């Protein structure tokens, strides 16, 4: 069964790329939903246009770049990815009878959070998230906005009460980050932790003052 990965319009497309790379590296299959707003963000942050007609090519180009926009070493094999148009409300993930392991929304904008919390289902991303909740599957929401007002905080509490895991895109610094990608990978790793997916994206805290930094 696949994981659904939804990409909303918040800044933070490198987080989505890191999660996708890790899922594929772990041998997971992915159903990808890229919202209209996120395509504008992706273009602004990476210069990549994500087009439905050429999504495999565009996804390979996206995943082959690091957070700094430079070429990465990732072998962008996207054979494990199935793309669904965000406007296709008849797509598989719109139904509870379509089997999935759960859904990761990364990054999640406040508009996306509100839509899911209120059950609006304005597009496939929101509909798939609502289905994930009603089917009691794992939903991880990586909210990437600051500051957060009372309305958004209440929406996040609603999602938590409904069974979602809310993972703010807030990197930690104890892992000895030296590059932007290290910070991105930490957040992506925490998203995957919440989903129960194994990975090696960051060094974990060991319970001493040395933290997760390498020794020797």
Curated annotation (Swiss-Prot):
Classification via SUPFAM superfamilies: Homo-oligomeric flavin-containing Cys decarboxylases, HFCD
Any GO molecular function: flavin prenyltransferase activity
Reaction(s) the record says it catalyses: dimethylallyl phosphate + FMNH2 = prenylated FMNH2 + phosphate
Residues engaged in binding dimethylallyl phosphate: 174, 190
EC number: 2.5.1.129
Enzyme superclass (EC): transferase
Top-rank lineage group of the source organism: Bacteria
Any one Pfam family match given in the protein's UniProt record, by short name: Flavoprotein
Keywords recorded for this protein, A-Z: Flavoprotein, FMN, Prenyltransferase, Transferase
InterPro entries registered for this protein in UniProt: Flavin_trans-like, Flavoprotein, UbiX-like
Binding site for FMN: 9-11, 35, 144
Function: Flavin prenyltransferase that catalyzes the synthesis of the prenylated FMN cofactor (prenyl-FMN) for 4-hydroxy-3-polyprenylbenzoic acid decarboxylase UbiD. The prenyltransferase is metal-independent and links a dimethylallyl moiety from dimethylallyl monophosphate (DMAP) to the flavin N5 and C6 atoms of FMN.
Similarity comment: family membership: Belongs to the UbiX/PAD1 family.
Stated name of the protein: Flavin prenyltransferase UbiX
Originating species: Streptomyces coelicolor (strain ATCC BAA-471 / A3(2) / M145)
Gene field: ubiX
